[in-house]
């Protein structure tokens, strides 16, 4: 692999981070990259326009991390920010959708369907499925759940992380239902604490598994045509070429 600075942005893996305002998107980016890439604040709507940050993440290689505005931004400029987020989705190779795990556990306990409790996330999940964009659901803020579990441990003598695992399973099953006929789209669910830096290896492993098999492959026609396009190829002929011997342009055309 060449120097990171020599890799054109268009050839890098674009990883888009999506979620509600204050779900921990920017904190997750900083934790995964181990850099202060994004501004983190308790004020909702800190991230406005999408921020594109080129970097290298092992073992994914050269990437572009896209930090987006919350898709529930109801501020004065919120609608325009969400439009910019939709534009970022067009460039995304793998999406990471961040959810607050406490909200997930509460919805599961109350028996509220995912598509109702997380209407925006469900709509974006379906959007990515239709685009065949793999998705990683990151259930964030497990540190708060673990603190609660530690309090229970002191009284019961047992630390139980079952709520976190149950939340992951619930999101996976519910999201499969949301996708419907698009359920074959690849997605995974991980539990993390962006604040404490926990679960980052799980995020990177999920991204690695979801990396499209043909990503980074160079084709003779580049991105000029897609798989199902109808193309007319014109091959030059060389009457002086030996019988049965293909000249280079013919070889390239057949490839």
Range-by-range predicted roles:
Residues 42, 72-77, 104-106, 111-116, ...:
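Short, flexible loop segments at the rims of nucleotide/cofactor-binding pockets, characterized by
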Residues 209-228, 232-255:
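C-terminal accessory "lid"/substrate-recognition subdomains
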Residues 45-46, 70-72, 101-105, 141-146, ...:
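Conserved nucleotide-binding/hydrolysis micro-motifs of P-loop NTPases
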Residues 2-79, 83-90:
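Conserved G1/Walker A P-loop phosphate-binding module
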Residues 16, 97, 230-232:
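Conserved beta-strand elements of the Class I
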Residues 1-13, 138, 144-145, 214:
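P-loop NTPase nucleotide-binding/switch module
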Residues 24, 143-145, 159, 163, ...:
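Conserved GTPase G-domain signal focused on the G5
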Residues 56-61, 80-189, 219-223, 245-255:
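Conserved C-terminal guanine-recognition region of P-loop GTPase G domains, centered on the G4
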């Amino acid at each position: 692999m060449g120097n990171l600075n020599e890799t054109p942005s268009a050839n890098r893996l674009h990883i888009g981070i999506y979620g509600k305002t204050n779900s921990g998107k920017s904190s997750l980016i900083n934790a995964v990259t181990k850099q202060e890439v994004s501004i983190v604040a308790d004020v909702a709507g800190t991230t406005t326009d999408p921020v594109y940050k080129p970097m290298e993440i092992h073992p994914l290689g050269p990437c572009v991390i896209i930090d987006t505005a919350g898709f529930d931004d109801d501020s004065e400029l919120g609608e325009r920010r969400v439009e910019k987020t939709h534009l970022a989705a067009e460039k995304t190779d793998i999406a990471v959708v961040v959810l607050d795990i406490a909200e997930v556990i509460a919805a599961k306990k109350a028996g509220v369907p995912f598509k109702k409790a997380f209407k925006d996330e469900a709509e974006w999940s379906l959007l990515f499925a239709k685009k065949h964009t793999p998705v990683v659901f990151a259930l964030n803020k497990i540190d708060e759940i673990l603190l609660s579990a530690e309090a229970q441990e002191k009284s019961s003598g047992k630390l139980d992380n079952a709520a976190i695992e149950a939340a992951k399973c619930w999101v996976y099953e519910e999201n499969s239902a949301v996708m419907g006929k698009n359920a074959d789209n690849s997605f995974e669910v991980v539990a993390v604490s962006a604040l404490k830096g926990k679960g980052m290896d799980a995020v990177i492993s999920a991204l690695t598994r979801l990396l499209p098999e043909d990503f980074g492959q160079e084709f003779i026609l580049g991105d000029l045509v897609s798989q199902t396009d109808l193309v007319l190829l014109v091959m030059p002929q060389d009457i002086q070429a030996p019988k049965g011997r293909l000249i280079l342009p013919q070889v390239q055309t057949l490839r």
